[in-house]
Amino acid sequence: MPGKHSDSATSELCEKCKENISILVVRAKPICHDCFARYVHTKAIKRLESFRVNFAASPDQQRKILLPLSHGVSSTTLLHILDLHLNTQRSKTNRTGFAISVLVVDEGSLDPARLDKVRERYANHDYASLPLHDVFRLLPDDASLRAFLPESQVQEVCSTQEQLTSLIASLTSATARADVLTTLRTRLIVEHAKQTGCESILWGDSTTRLAEKTLAETAKGRGFSLPWQISDGKSPFDINFHYPLRDVLKKELFSYVDLAEPALSALVYEPQSGATQASMSSKNTTIDDLMKQYFESVEENFPSIVSNVVRTTGKLEVPTGATSNPRCSLCGMPVPDGRFGIHGWGGDQHGGADDAAAVSGGSLCYGCTRSIPQRGTAVASK
Amino acid sequence: MPPSPCALCHTNRALILRPKDHSKLCKACFITVFETEIHHTITTNALFTRGERIAIGASGGKDSTVLASVLKTLNERYDYGLDLVLLSIDEGIKGYRDDSLETVKRNAEQYGMDLTILGYDELYGWTMDQVVEQVGKKGNCTYCGVFRRQALDRGAARLGVKHVVTGHNADDVAETVLMNLLRGDLPRLSRTTSIITSTPSASSDPASNTNIKRSKPLKYAYEKEIVLYAHHKSLDYFSTECIYSPEAFRGSARALIKNLERVRPSAILDVVRSGEDMAKLVPGSDEGCGGTCSSNIPVAEEEEGGCGSANGRTVGGDMANMEKQLAQNDTAADQNLEVEITSKKINGAGMPLATGKKGKKGFTPRKSTKQVMGQCKICGYLSSQDVCKACVLLGGLNKARPKNKIEIGYEVQDLQQRDQGADGVANALQRTSIGGD
């Protein structure tokens, strides 16, 4: 996975500084250790110019941002870079441009010792850990989420953990389960950021991850939401989204993890790489897995194409007045013209019988309707 | 496990697992559902009007054969009132196109439709066999694709037909959406996802090469279902691939589409839906509603389902070439960053990052300009340049030719146009009758 290391027998000079011996080939250029670190730092910090030190503000008016940490390569690297950046700001100007709040979402397999190690190494930030099922507790309009629970669960009063378990169990495919889990995780992170007073969320998505997301959401029928999901700036949730690592490839981050001093490997936990290759049967493979495999192979030989996909999608514009469109109850995206459900467009081949179900089917966007099973009878009875 | 009954009629035994939604159907119900869905696509998008004359782009392959069969069936069943004709383009490839055209001739007899065959040599003075002799096998697909795009419109104009239907299916459209994302081609997204496109006209001349509608009635039909339909109706179609593109293999987008379909059957339609939604998000695009209302989107650069539609339209070197070009763009952008880094190094020696000394913001690419459609100076066909691409390629071919045995008759005047049209039809009829012997 790391970038190609140059052969020590035929070492050549770093192409940037012309002084040190190169240890890595980045985008077809040999580069040394220091220049590579500077390369990654520059790419990330360049994206955060709006978070520079605000000398006009008083020290107690500190801006707060949230960093969701999954213990993967990308979010761990982002935390490392931001920590370094804040230390530099503090040592030069005796204050920082923002404060970091780190959130770890527990989906059942979280090892608390991992978070302790991170906290120990980057001690100057707030840390929180929340279970995923807290999304049912935090969302103010949780009634709309509860509507997707299976029939038997609606009547009873049960814990948020049981609600989450039964919701996921009612989904019929691995892609649907992965899709809903991702959506709920995003909602949880957003709600936590709002309630803790953060003005922005810094996601650790690399170029490769954003390209994967572009094609995965396209394949799930959420093309309309791509401007919200890929671009820096406003999100549909009244909070800003930023992707500081959007110009760095995933393989470059893997190299960075190995080369940082001390190495970040002890903090990183990437469980999926083995599991992804093992489960090649179509039963367990998800659309996200497929796109991940695809772009990891494209990235090896054609890294500029990966960048180009992200750049292209970044050009898509949110239509004027889009924020006033009705929202999907699950993912929260504004649906153009309120076209909910999978009916009522050119590709829908069924006649009027389903129109009644579509009207009473609630307010899910096309992509979420593909994941959540239809409950026409139950929904119509409400 | 006992055989399950059909999900629709609950009487017959289910023999077909439907690719689109994995429902189990018997043969009769599958055929009915397939045809009804095409009918639904035609009516909801208002593709046809009563009394309209429609040319079906027929290649002898499965898509156009199924299209012709379904349109004939629906035209009779629902009384569209259409006049259907078959229009074939003969690229002049021995051993491939002449065999597939035999299939089209048989189809014309079976369906009772008029058939017109136009050859590249008739339109351009060159057959693909001759082009390959001249330029070799590499790159000849470019000539064929450019010629074919124009040929269908010029053939329709000769017949006086204002509407051409093609056999593009959902897999083709979804593949094109993904390819355009991978290539970074946003303006093309709108064109490829629209079910109706047309060649805008600078003149109101009814006999000109413009003002011809194109539509794709099979846009929401899966390729696998088209094959199943052809099989269960015992349709006669030709399935050999083009002999001049043996190196064409499944492109990235094609393989990706097939993998997606395996993971989730609806993914192909989901990609088509996303493509339609994204087309409205492209900056500078006309505010159409999913391409349904916009019937005047220019067709000029729409990709045809070319020879060997089962193969990807991406040749192996495309991604490498694009990578090289994009890498150069990135290098140019990096020059700015490099200058910035150097200046920082001078100011703050040893500091990894200087604060508050940001120089240039970086490389800002210019917005792509919109294409303006005009007419080719030489042949009068639609073109955004002075001379259309086919004439440019033709000029290159003719320069290398020792002497011109066949002169291309350009249709400059109305009278000449009508004469050409009449001659074309007569020649086609002769060819048909010869084939009948």
Swiss-Prot record, chain A:
Superkingdom field: Eukaryota
Biological process, per Gene Ontology: protein urmylation; tRNA thio-modification; tRNA wobble position uridine thiolation; tRNA wobble uridine modification
PANTHER family according to UniProt: CYTOPLASMIC TRNA 2-THIOLATION PROTEIN 2 (PTHR20882:SF14)
Role according to the record: Plays a central role in 2-thiolation of mcm(5)S(2)U at tRNA wobble positions of tRNA(Lys), tRNA(Glu) and tRNA(Gln). May act by forming a heterodimer with NCS6 that ligates sulfur from thiocarboxylated URM1 onto the uridine of tRNAs at wobble position. Prior mcm(5) tRNA modification by the elongator complex is required for 2-thiolation. May also be involved in protein urmylation.
GO cellular component: cytosol
Subcellular location: Cytoplasm
A single GO molecular function term of this UniProt record: tRNA binding
Protein family according to the UniProt entry: Belongs to the CTU2/NCS2 family.
SUPFAM superfamilies, A to Z: Adenine nucleotide alpha hydrolases-like
Cytoplasm in keyword set: yes
Pathway linked to the protein: tRNA modification; 5-methoxycarbonylmethyl-2-thiouridine-tRNA biosynthesis
Record key words, sorted: Cytoplasm, tRNA processing
Protein name: Cytoplasmic tRNA 2-thiolation protein 2
Gene source species: Phaeosphaeria nodorum (strain SN15 / ATCC MYA-4574 / FGSC 10173)
